[in-house]
Amino acid sequence: MNQPWRTHLQTKLKQLHEQGQYRNLHVTEQAEETWLIRDEKRMLNLASNNYLGLAGDERLKEAAIVCTRKYGTGATASRLVVGNYSLYEEVERSICNWKGTEKALVVNSGFTANVGAISSLACRHDIVFSDKLNHASIVDGIILSGAEHKRYRHNDLNHLEALLKTASPEKRKLIVTDTVFSMDGDTAHLRELVQLKEKYGAIIIVDEAHASGIYGIGGAGLSHIEKDLAQKIDIHMGTFSKALGCYGAYLTGDAIYIEYLQNMMRSFIFTTALPPSTLGAVQKAIEIVQEDHKRRENLIANGEYFRSKLREAGFNIGNSSTHIVPIVVGSNENTLRFSKRLQEAGIAAIAIRPPTVPVHSSRIRFAVTSQHTIADLKWAIDRITHIAKEEELFV
């Protein structure tokens, strides 16, 4: 191997070890279930994004099998060549009906959706205003676009407005935000963001990755809690890989935006389409989340219970108001130690460290699902509290 490269890589890996930021892969089985197997140990699954328990649903499995038998295992090409199966058209129509939008585009992942959409829409003559805690894919899309990047303090509307006020009136403006923040479990102030968008002549993109299938009318997303609000969002992004239990993502909004992305988005143009099996499962999942109110109600209730009990026990869970509940520890060292003890006790509790979260805010990110019982959550809370006291971390 080239020696300068070897030296550089070894130095970087050593730094990651020293900073407590080195990452390993762990073999996991049955991750679609409430209890999983990780490194051959049975654990309560409080780490996955399978929020509605659909990843193991027999109806989705059957839909995927039917489409595999009919269409084969691969799309064979990009959608703009010969990979645009009729399944794509069906799923995109379902998304438009679900979200109340004109046109939709199915893409390969939430990451490629954000990177591709933002870098296609914005250029060096534009300004993008982004919440400081937005997902890495949003940040990378802005960097790739070459646009001026204005980060506003998390959920700080006054700071955002100050930045909008001082922006050149000649420049196009784009505001982008997560709706449910993936590492904090709090939510964006969408109505106020839309008001600022309209006041300063911007457009807005919302990332519904952790809200699609859960919140709003028919689980259409946080922006659909109020119908008139959703109609004022320019572009909605959401994923099929979390609450819907599948894989892939969508972009939807007014036809002109989606037509533009279809023609300009490099992460859409230059990639092989999703396999037919995935599209079959996605179509079934969209049907289920609109009809199965009980799953969504269970998830919201479980989130409320878990948050309230952790707060009562004295844990710092920030401003979480959803099914994503962090316990903020602080240092990498203490977070890794806490995570190790929890896993030894039978809880899949994963340490989240920089650069995923800001420095000095390392945490355990818990995610409850609709399939957890109150007994499951109580069992976990008892062990979390006991271990935290033993380790003298915070309680």
Swiss-Prot record:
Gene3D superfamilies per record: Aspartate Aminotransferase, domain 1, Type I PLP-dependent aspartate aminotransferase-like (Major domain)
Family matches, as InterPro entries: Aminotrans_II_pyridoxalP_BS (IPR001917), Aminotransferase_I/II_large (IPR004839), AON_synthase_class-II (IPR050087), AONS_Archaea/Proteobacteria (IPR004723), PyrdxlP-dep_Trfase (IPR015424), PyrdxlP-dep_Trfase_major (IPR015421), PyrdxlP-dep_Trfase_small (IPR015422)
Residues engaged in binding pyridoxal 5'-phosphate: G110, F111, S182, D207, E208, A209, H210, T239, F240, S241, K242
Reactions performed catalytically: 6-carboxyhexanoyl-[ACP] + L-alanine + H(+) = (8S)-8-amino-7-oxononanoate + holo-[ACP] + CO2
Binding site for substrate: R23, H135, T356
MF terms (GO), sorted A to Z: 8-amino-7-oxononanoate synthase activity; pyridoxal phosphate binding
Enzyme Commission numbers on file: 2.3.1.47
Family as reported in the entry's similarity comment: Belongs to the class-II pyridoxal-phosphate-dependent aminotransferase family. BioF subfamily.
PANTHER family for the chain: 8-AMINO-7-OXONONANOATE SYNTHASE, CLASS II AMINOTRANSFERASE/8-AMINO-7-OXONONANOATE SYNTHASE
NCBIfam families: bioF
Subunit structure and binding partners: Homodimer.
Protein name (record): Putative 8-amino-7-oxononanoate synthase
Organism: Bacillus anthracis
